[in-house]
Swiss-Prot record:
Subcellular location as annotated: Endoplasmic reticulum membrane; Nucleus membrane
Domain FCP1 homology: start-end pairs: 299-460
Organism: Schizosaccharomyces pombe (strain 972 / ATCC 24843)
Polar residues: compositionally biased ranges: 234-256
Protein's UniProt name: Nuclear envelope morphology protein 1
Swiss-Prot/TrEMBL keywords: Endoplasmic reticulum, Glycoprotein, Hydrolase, Membrane, Nucleus, Protein phosphatase, Transmembrane, Transmembrane helix
Amino acid sequence: MNSIARLSDEINKAILATPLDDDEADKEKLANARGRASSATLRHYNRRRSSYSASSLSSLSSKPTEKEVPTRNEKPKHANIMRVVVYWIRVFLKRIYTFFVHSARVFLYHFLNEEKEFTLASFFWGLCRFVFFPVLLSYKRREMLPPQPSVRRPRFYSSYSYPSSHQDPAYSSFKRHRSSNSYSSSSNGNHVRFQPSIAEEEISFNSFSNSLNSEEDVCVSPMKPKEVSLMGKANSNRSGHSHQPQSTQFSPPANDNISKLPSSFTIVNDPLKSPSSSRLRIRNITLCADKIPRPLLNSKLPRKTLVLDLDETLIHSVSRGSRTTSGQPIEVHVPGEHPILYYIHKRPHLDYFLSNVSQWFRLILFTASVQPYADPIIDYLERDKKIFAKRYYRQHCALVDSSFVKDISICNIHLSRIMIIDNSPASYNAHKENAIPIEGWISDPSDVDLLNLLSFLHALQYVHDVRDLLGLRLAK
């Protein structure tokens, strides 16, 4: 039994030992193969590494630096801009070329015949279309226009018995003899020119002699006032007429060399109608003057003076001890007394009122207050620019029945050109015809009295005598 066990053990050992020898041989073979592979791989890796290093070095040498990168990036931008500019220049030149080519083709097309061939006949036909036809069309268009008068018509500066478009037959003769200073005559009437005393304006009078068809034209220079006599009286002796137009006769100066002058010229004015330019009718008179007549009145009237009150007309002042403390504080220094603080309130729209009336009138401030009180307030009103030409105070007033009366005659202005605006009737009691009353103002913020006066004051600057207009207030 023991021998059998021993035999089995040996067999097992032999079986187990045989694979182990084969594994070791395989391991050796594998190790040798791995060694050969590793050496080949190492050699291949070294070759790849050397080639990679060479390529990397060459690429690194050719790679731009950081400083060179922006310059290369800028070049495409400039190239793009230049490309756009060149493109638009090409477009512009192409359009100019197309325009000239098209114009030349259109121009040359007029010199071709219907078969689009250039011949001598087609050339002359195109020349006629370009040169002669426009001239003929303009001539034809000129013939279609209404004919223009060949003789210059006289200028009329007023409307009289016949319309201004009427051509006076004596005007041509009057024009011929205009340069001469002596007497001249024509076949259809008497044309007289006196020696020019004033000179330049001439009046042509047409008067009927015996019938309506026969006229006598007299051309007279304006004479001195002593050579014209006015005899205007209404004829009331005729029966059957309620009124007769008033007539004014102008007698020309006597001259021994003139025998055919009419005795008088009649201007008819209806006393029942308004003496305006449309109502005034001058019979048988035609005005032929080279210049517009001079105005009878001087257009430049002297500048008028406007006197303004201070307290309760332009401003309202409140002392320091009152309830309200708003407004502009102004300290008043009265000699011999302590300074007093006043709060000044402007009347609504005062600045706008003063800025307008200062352009129309010469302004004077006349107040019944004392000078130490009034001067700081007036200076406050004139802080932007000087408004008042003069200032008058309580010492310039007259005390009448315990009231201060302002005598505006001390301003040395004629009473026809001076006005006063005051809220106290006692202040302008001496010159009521020069006064413009106004309501006193204390604290009403909706007051518009100064604005309402502007349109009236604007009209007063063109009045000859302000008393004629302001005195209507006193008429009963």
